[in-house]
Amino acid sequence: MENFKTRRSVIQFEDVSFEYPGAETDSIHHISLDVKEGEFLVLTGGSGCGKTTLTRLINGLAEQFYEGTLKGRVTLLGRSISEYPLYEIGKKVGSIFQDPKSQFFASITEDEIAFGCENYGVPYEELDGRVSSAIKRINGDMLRGKEIYPMSSGEKQKIAVASVNAVDPEIYVFDEPSANLDMYSVEALKNLMSALKAEGHTIIVAEHRLYYLTDLADRFLYMENGSIKEKWTAQERLSIPEGKRRAIGIRAADLHHIEVDIPPAKEKNMTMEVKDLTFSYRKHPVFHNISFQAYAGDLIAIVGHNGVGKTTLSNILC
């Protein structure tokens, strides 16, 4: 692990608590944190532990977009976060959300990638170069000129990263970026993050999946009930005993040794049958002639690359 003690602080939390309207308790409370320039920080913990709220305080969405009461002080690049207008934070902190389509403003790839730069007044003669550079960064030449909505989750994630990269912020915040990605897309995401880290960007990732971040992370912060309970280096994270890992509910660092207890089905009564199911979206074929049967007690996994129709099939069945 690199020694970051001598580097400048880019994000600081001083005894920070935040409460959403109507909540009985703070979403996070008494958080103190110092993130250094170029550091790769991973926030992990169970759902509702405060990871997302912490990222919203870094990118300015908490208070300025999501109403709530902030106590303590959050400092971004030497200034109180409260002193920044939201548009100025966006130049310094780029955000990639769990569901990329929630942050899209355009329907065509190049238009979306250029959108942030256009709003920040980037000169037209510079704009094309920034867009091309961002597309190259994600290996996205095959995505040029395409509609975004029919894309797979992995492709949308790439466009989200490219749109942020075109603005060229110093800090990147990812909120559960792998949640909707298959293994190949996760590997592509890891490669993108690795390149950003190599360039010296500060990266904060709130995530449940941890296996792909072990080689990248400088620190892991484990959160529970709105507080930071434990801090680990990457090596310390790997050394956590299996019993403790299961007890605190964090994901495995090695996917090759996962034990799952699946009880055998007690009945064999057919509860569902699908015959020759075909579906297209706006003339884009999604899948065709799918047939299968499901029986009471069955546990069926629908697997495949992003974009092959897993979610569409699930939506039809539901």
Model feature map: region roles:
Residues E147-M151, E155:
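Conserved ABC ATPase signature
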Residues Y172-D175:
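Catalytic Walker B motif of ABC-type/P-loop ATPase nucleotide-binding domains
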Residues E125-L143:
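Conserved ABC ATPase "signature" region
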Residues E67-R79:
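Conserved ABC transporter NBD signature motif
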Residues E207-H208:
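H-loop/switch region of ABC-family ATPase nucleotide-binding domains
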Residues V161-A162:
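Hydrophobic anchor residue at the start of the ABC signature
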Residues T44-G46, V303-H305:
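The feature captures the beta-strand-to-loop junction immediately N-terminal to the Walker
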